[in-house]
Amino acid sequence: MGGPAAPRGAGRLRALLLALVVAGIPAGAYNLDPQRPVHFQGPADSFFGYAVLEHFHDNTRWVLVGAPKADSKYSPSVKSPGAVFKCRVHTNPDRRCTELDMARGKNRGTSCGKTCREDRDDEWMGVSLARQPKADGRVLACAHRWKNIYYEADHILPHGFCYIIPSNLQAKGRTLIPCYEEYKKKYGEEHGSCQAGIAGFFTEELVVMGAPGSFYWAGTIKVLNLTDNTYLKLNDEVIMNRRYTYLGYAVTAGHFSHPSTIDVVGGAPQDKGIGKVYIFRADRRSGTLIKIFQASGKKMGSYFGSSLCAVDLNGDGLSDLLVGAPMFSEIRDEGQVTVYINRGNGALEEQLALTGDGAYNAHFGESIASLDDLDNDGFPDVAIGAPKEDDFAGAVYIYHGDAGGIVPQYSMKLSGQKINPVLRMFGQSISGGIDMDGNGYPDVTVGAFMSDSVVLLRARPVITVDVSIFLPGSINITAPQCHDGQQPVNCLNVTTCFSFHGKHVPGEIGLNYVLMADVAKKEKGQMPRVYFVLLGETMGQVTEKLQLTYMEETCRHYVAHVKRRVQDVISPIVFEAAYSLSEHVTGEEERELPPLTPVLRWKKGQKIAQKNQTVFERNCRSEDCAADLQLQGKLLLSSMDEKTLYLALGAVKNISLNISISNLGDDAYDANVSFNVSRELFFINMWQKEEMGISCELLESDFLKCSVGFPFMRSKSKYEFSVIFDTSHLSGEEEVLSFIVTAQSGNTERSESLHDNTLVLMVPLMHEVDTSITGIMSPTSFVYGESVDAANFIQLDDLECHFQPINITLQVYNTGPSTLPGSSVSISFPNRLSSGGAEMFHVQEMVVGQEKGNCSFQKNPTPCIIPQEQENIFHTIFAFFTKSGRKVLDCEKPGISCLTAHCNFSALAKEESRTIDIYMLLNTEILKKDSSSVIQFMSRAKVKVDPALRVVEIAHGNPEEVTVVFEALHNLEPRGYVVGWIIAISLLVGILIFLLLAVLLWKMGFFRRRYKEIIEAEKNRKENEDSWDWVQKNQ
């Protein structure tokens, strides 16, 4: 199967054609041609272009230009009265403009009535121009600064002056001084300073002139009925008594009440500072103007009502209204135009506000003009000037009417500096609605008075291309009709047909087009589901160039294949044919106004393209083809007991979600299960027990989508699979790890069956840690006493006490497995020898390692205290001889007064440690007063975790408490004067003991010795012994 192939040109040409087609028609290149402007130049510094008017008489087209500061060759004695110039469009190769002769008075003081003598100096002739809307329509030209000097000794009266010029621009016209009244001479009162003609409008029967200076600048509108040559008067006292509102600053007229009646509109831009606009019914019976509608501006100083345009935007026969507020500001004078749509009987409803590009100081809305039907779409169009945009270069925006009122987006923006860099205040005046070059389309004329220039911009013919894309009604995805190689594939025939028509368009055109498949997917950045096959090549789009004949249809035929394993069989397959004109050759060009190349019709800012779509067939039992998906699931933590109620950060490496999805309804197309997960999880894999056509794709870091079943999930089927996520990067900032699992399909699903389509699985996240603390003391012991050298201790400035430095280092260690988000350590030191004793320790500093924490403690206000006791030599000696062995100071024992410090840590990662260094001084003067020979200090430190931070301490882990011990040893040597006393008392005691013994011995007779008897007895004994010895020898 197949159709004719597209021309196989170079890839470069194809890319160029694609760029042209996709780009569409830029806003600056619709059917007004800025490349070939017709430029008219006026006298220097004359404000040539302040007002412009397109005009025709018979077959001659003219551009009429007001130059309100020009000198007049017909009135050389008048100082800068201003002039109206006529510029012929055809047969005027030099673009010359000539002044209209209005047969005006040439001298100051020319009579103009019983009590009227004119002064034309600086009268600003040409400040406004208007044309009667018919074939031989006359022209209205005004000079609002024209003055009546009849009473110049008392008052000079700026009545204003208008002149009706015949259609042929040659015969003498009619003079209008609408504010002149005989014998009225006071400036300001009534119409004495009315300045009529500052704005003017012409209908078939009415001449409308604004007079903003009447009634002390309350203003009014002067309306002349040409049928009976009478003026319609405004008698509304409420309006007339509102001074300084400037009613009549802008005027227009239209069919507001009924398609057959004319109503008059006047703007009062100073009314209450915000501006107003009024619509008046012209009641010819009473000869008055009766107010039927009013609207107010929205911001102070916006000058709402300073420009007006009545135009039937939606083609319902009733005029709609555009009101300019050129000084409307968000930043500075960007300008705004409010659009009011006529709902009948003069009831207007605000539709929207237009702002152009909202450029700084643009004064968008300074001028508004109806252009008639610029592009032949059946609805009138309008131009809005922004003369100060681009630093006074100026711009004009073109907006199109439609059945709804007005298209909010402008179709083109005409930039003055791009048309001609010399243009200044381009857009101050605009005129349109007349075909100036004879090609059947109305053209637009724009004034740029600060460069004394006028530009005629011609409209190009507009081509309407009719495009049809023919597709099969549906695609049966279960019955392939084509082959791609050896593989059967689904396919469809695609036919595109083109024809064109338009007003005054060429008989033949060249058309570039690009036919794209499945554009809805491409616009979403997704892969298309179909592709074209041309001569064995596959491509996502077809690019061709056609030659079309007027009102004849040309068709092309193609074959598109459906990709295998298409997931989405619910959304339609959209084909789009985007097209653009090829380069058009216009033939021989005329010297003055060469023919313009046509353009394609603008589609209200949309892409110039045509779309059609087809769908996949579906096999459904119910009319609404409703699926009924049911979702079940369970969390499984790896390497964890099922009884564990939380996920320990760092302990669990991955987590699995076991999912079961069932379909109890019709076949579910594009069935999928999506997972909204934490961005800290990483998708590892999807597991299924057997191949069931399930595939998963991570669309975002926190969004996983799994397609279930291909090409659809059958009715009464069930699928089970698991998705596995890596949890090693969880930070723990979230309290709960949640999974939102949703089952959905492209089918509709009844509301009563949606309750089981979503599953929320959650598990708390906890920090599981095993903390421990160790400590060391330096020194572990020291000796104190009176005989200990003072150099072993330190003294603080101006203090007598001797201090022993004590340094303690504590280390907190986190074994893991989780990071410890925060912890604290409490430390206690025995600080007094007794409950009422003085404080012994003075903490100098506590430092947390790496500055990842802070400590707090209570400083000792009086670190140096020397206990003062009443000296008693006998008590001192007694204490020396009765010193006990060891005293233990432990904060856990009752009655012990302790110093407590606290330290808080920041996060402590797994297998990391944190140290606390404590620098203290111990007052040894207090120790000296104690009777113990050894004082043992037991300092304790304990690490604590905060349950509020979701921290769990592992049971039966490392100890969270440590005891650090050091000892103070007394040297047991008494003071010097005590030693003397001990020696003296010892001698005294010895003598007393000796005397006591002597007395005792004396009393016992120790000193009564019988020396004589003893000696004699000893002598006798010796003799006896001697005689015994002799006897024995003789035997």
From Swiss-Prot:
It holds the Pfam family Integrin_A_Ig_3. The keyword RNA-binding does not apply. Heterodimer of an alpha and a beta subunit. Alpha-9 (ITGA9) associates with beta-1 (ITGB1). Integrin ITGA9:ITGB1 interacts with FBLN5 (via N-terminus). Integrin ITGA9:ITGB1 interacts with SPP1/OPN (via N-terminus). Integrin ITGA9:ITGB1 interacts with TNC/TNFN3 (via the 3rd Fibronectin type-III domain). Integrin ITGA9:ITGB1 interacts with SVEP1/polydom (via Sushi domain 21); thereby inhibits Ca(2+) intracellular signaling and as a result represses vasocontraction. Expressed in vascular smooth muscle cells (at protein level). Expressed in the airway epithelium (at protein level). One of its GO terms (biological process) is cell adhesion. One of its GO terms (molecular function) is integrin binding involved in cell-matrix adhesion. Keywords: Calcium, Cell adhesion, Disulfide bond, Glycoprotein, Integrin, Membrane, Metal-binding, Receptor, Repeat, Signal, Transmembrane, Transmembrane helix. The keyword Transmembrane helix applies. The record marks R565, V566 as: Cleavage. This is Integrin alpha-9. It comes from Homo sapiens. Integrin alpha-9/beta-1 (ITGA9:ITGB1) is a receptor for VCAM1, cytotactin and osteopontin. It recognizes the sequence A-E-I-D-G-I-E-L in cytotactin. ITGA9:ITGB1 may play a crucial role in SVEP1/polydom-mediated myoblast cell adhesion. Integrin ITGA9:ITGB1 represses PRKCA-mediated L-type voltage-gated channel Ca(2+) influx and ROCK-mediated calcium sensitivity in vascular smooth muscle cells via its interaction with SVEP1, thereby inhibiting vasocontraction. FG-GAP repeats lie at residues 35-96, 111-174, 182-232, 233-289, 290-349, 351-408, 411-474.
